[in-house]
């Protein structure tokens, strides 16, 4: 007897009461009903959500409304983290983790940091990329906005199985939803990189590392995301696309760390040598301009050297 897909979907909607869960069920198990699979889907979603917000305490997040600079949709929820509500620690790839403090509960803010337009799927964790109250315009230039308008179809293809986009990206978010939000942010940042906007390649690397951490936290293989981040950071260094010296030094440090993690000690050592070259060049410049300093260069050089000294430790990147 032929499978009645419509009837299966109807019953799944009744049992799961969530169109996105129904689509996920069908993607994993096909158009057949199995109580064990339904239970597994529910448990996976509950577990993913519970890891995002833990413990008792006040809510560390407040919501503001923004408007999309690409399609004009307004009243999009943007989740902001309250000042001093979380102790923020960064791993060896400079990706933050969060611990509640001062009476606030622990929340993995990285999971909800990216704001997503439910209409055109423009996405960014930076509220300056959005239109806000008092006629505050997006910092993204008009030519990039036009390109993003033309690429709506590409972004929709990334979440084509999602029935209710607004609900899917609402709070709390499961791990798969968080990854999807960063994939959409990567789509935006690639357009910025095409127009050679400052920090675009740095953002691409940072978003890839957020995905890598989420995958790592869910016990998955994050190697490809780490490789993606390394590639973006190398291109950022090659093109000098980071005007801030602090960010540029972070990029070089991250290249060293990622190279060691991925087993390329030769590359890591070559970028550690970059720090030495930059220090020497700055020392020469300081003879002409005493206001210049090597402080930032030396700070990140020292962090890279510490990793290099521990390069043979098996547990060096156990949390990354």
Protein language model features and the residues they cover:
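Amphipathic alpha-helical repeat scaffolds of TPR domains
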Residues: 142-218, 246-261, 298-307
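Acidic, Ser/Thr-rich low-complexity linear motifs
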Residues: 84-88, 283-296
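TPR/TPR-like (Sel1-like) alpha-helical repeat modules
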Residues: 266-284
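N-terminal cysteine/histidine-rich coordination modules
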Residues: 1-143
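Alpha-helical linker/edge segments of TPR/alpha-solenoid repeat scaffolds
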Residues: 3-49, 211-218, 254-271, 293-320
């Amino acid at each position: 007897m032929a499978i009645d897909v419509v009837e299966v979907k109807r019953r799944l909607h009744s049992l799961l009461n969530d169109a996105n869960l129904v689509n996920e069920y069908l993607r994993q198990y096909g158009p057949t009903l199995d109580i064990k699979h339904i239970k597994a889907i529910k448990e996976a979603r509950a577990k993913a959500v519970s890891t995002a917000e833990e413990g008792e305490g006040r809510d560390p997040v407040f919501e503001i409304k923004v408007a999309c600079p690409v399609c004009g949709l307004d009243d999009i929820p943007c989740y902001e983290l309250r000042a001093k509500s979380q102790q923020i620690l960064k791993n060896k790839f400079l990706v933050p983790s969060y611990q509640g403090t001062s009476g606030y509960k622990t929340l993995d803010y990285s999971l909800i940091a990216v704001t997503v337009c439910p209409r055109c799927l423009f996405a960014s964790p930076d509220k300056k990329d959005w239109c806000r109250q008092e006629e505050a315009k997006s910092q993204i230039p008009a030519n990039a906005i036009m390109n993003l308008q033309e690429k709506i179809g590409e972004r929709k293809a990334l979440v084509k199985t999602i029935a209710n986009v607004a609900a899917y990206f609402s709070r709390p978010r499961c791990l798969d939803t968080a990854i999807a939000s960063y994939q959409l942010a990567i789509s935006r940042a690639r357009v910025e990189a095409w127009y050679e906007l400052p920090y675009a390649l740095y953002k691409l690397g940072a978003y890839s590392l957020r995905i890598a951490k989420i995958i790592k936290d869910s016990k998955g293989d994050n190697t490809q995301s780490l490789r993606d981040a390394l590639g973006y950071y190398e291109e950022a260094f090659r093109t000098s696309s980071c005007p801030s010296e602090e960010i540029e030094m972070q990029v070089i440090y991250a290249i060293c760390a990622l190279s060691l993690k991925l087993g390329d000690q030769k590359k890591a050592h070559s970028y550690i040598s970059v720090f030495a070259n930059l220090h020497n060049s700055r020392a020469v410049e300081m003879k002409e301009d005493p206001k210049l300093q090597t402080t930032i260069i030396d700070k990140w050089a020292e962090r890279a050297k510490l990793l290099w000294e521990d390069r043979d430790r098996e547990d060096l990147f156990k949390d990354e």
